Amino acid sequence: MVLPVPEALHDPLVIQLDALGFEAFWEEPDRLKAYMPASQWRAAVREAVRDLLRRQGLPDEIEVRTIEPENWNARWESQLQPIAVGPFLIKPSWHAVPEAYATHIVLEIDPKMSFGTGYHESTRLLLQMLPDCVEPGARVLDAGTGTGILTIAALKLGAGSAIAFDIDPWAAENAQENFARNGVADRVEFRQGSIEVVPERDFDLILANIHRRVLCELLPAFREKVRPTGYVLLSGLLREERELMLETAAAHDLEPIHEATENAWWAVMLKRTV
């Protein structure tokens, strides 16, 4: 769906569109593209979007298209350059490690169609938090692992084992390729699906870089699965979503002990209160 929206209104509209079930967004200077599975598109959704536009004083004209699955990352992955984030150097497999970063922890990530390259603020925010909460031998749960970058980073910092899950079929292949490429495949188990595929508890660290609606749904399970001394790291959130997210966390006995922002994005480190 393509909306004629000025850039200043993108962030508040993304929050409201997310609540309607849209799962991905692409921003351009004078328009906003929003994506949802075709099976979920209804006339009621169209009318709700038009109402949002009218309330912002905008024309309620929208353009809707059905698109076929495509490996969008193939268009730009050849342009990916190594990037340093905290103690990490993130690079695609076809780039050598620049000499200036020889002492960094290398995360070799080929993205394909999965999310998590280090080029998005939400990924960088969690990577920067990780060194403060990964204990030697820690058990890690990575929700919505995407490329597997957060799992790989945690294991390279000294975590002992990880379970990584994702509902996206592309992630199943991509994450496992990246686990093998980074030499951590023997310490991580990938599972296809959502939180129901993880009956285990007592994780030292839970990682989730997903949009707010899904995070709110997963928080009760995160509270049950994290150790009393463990950490829950959340990202994929806009600054405007902070208060709602903290209220939801508090309702599940989770409190913030560290927060970080970059541009419009916000991330938080939570611990159990009881």
Regions found by a protein language model. Give the residues of each.
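Conserved SAM/SAH cofactor-binding pocket of Class I
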Residues: M113, T117-D202
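N-terminal auxiliary segments of SAM/dcSAM-dependent transferases
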Residues: M1-A100
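S-adenosylmethionine
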Residues: C133, I167-V274
